[in-house]
Amino acid sequence: MASPAKKVVKKKKEKKNIPNGVAHIQATFNNTIITITDPAGNVVAWSSAGGKGFKGSRKSTPFAAQVAAEDCAKKAQDHGMRSVEVYVKGPGSGRESALRALQAAGFHVNFIRDVTPIPHNGCRPPKRRRV
């Protein structure tokens, strides 16, 4: 006879009091991912355009990035966060709108830094599209 399925006990997320943190905005051509961490790098909140219900080419729009940033900011503010340092990575269209959404949500932005990786002539890029 098969043993009964064990119940998985999920730990309840405790509310940490983190006054300042780091917001990482990764804006690719297909999606925008926002992650807010504490200064040590431990993730406090995250959200993405695809996770907020946008599919296909709508994930890469500035509006989708704005919705994802608002959601992530709300989660982080539940932990008592008030000010962030912003690191922006990638060439996507959601860069500016995600940043504006974080500011509109009530965060005090200490500084904004572009950390897009630029190759020193590394890998060959994909060939140009012919439509």
Curated annotation (Swiss-Prot):
Q: Which InterPro entries match?
A: Ribosomal_uS11, Ribosomal_uS11_bac-type, Ribosomal_uS11_CS, Ribosomal_uS11_sf
Task: Tell me the Gene Ontology biological-process terms attached to this UniProt entry.
Answer: translation
- Its signal peptide is none
GO molecular function terms noted in the UniProt entry: rRNA binding; structural constituent of ribosome
Q: Which Gene3D superfamilies match?
A: Ribosomal protein S11
Residues folding into a coiled coil are none
Q: What GO CC annotations are associated with the protein?
A: ribonucleoprotein complex; ribosome
Q: How does it assemble?
A: Part of the 30S ribosomal subunit. Interacts with proteins S7 and S18. Binds to IF-3.
The family assignment reads: Belongs to the universal ribosomal protein uS11 family.
Q: What name goes with this protein?
A: Small ribosomal subunit protein uS11
Q: Which organism is it from?
A: Geobacter metallireducens (strain ATCC 53774 / DSM 7210 / GS-15)
